[in-house]
Amino acid sequence: MELKKILATRRSVRKYLDRQVEKEVLQRVVDMALSAPSSRNTRSTRLWVVTDKSQLATISQMRDYGAAFVKDAPAAILVMGDKDKSDLWLDNCAITATILQL
């Protein structure tokens, strides 16, 4: 698929089917996201896959707004940065998060 088409047809989903995402699918997504470039190749981004309903509910309450939909999701991938590995950890997280959104 062409990049232009991927960017033009990408969409956000806030309503989910009541079924699990296969572990293999989640692992492929994580592997692809972690292949994203990083500043000075520091690889400071960490991903945490959450499928536990109680943890998803807790995560959905971590912000005042904009995260409530997470409680109904079958899985979430949290993007975190290791401050000790790079002073540009936040930039690296943003790059990885962008790949995840595609």
Task: Locate predicted features.
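Acidic, surface-exposed loops and disordered segments
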Residues: M1-L102
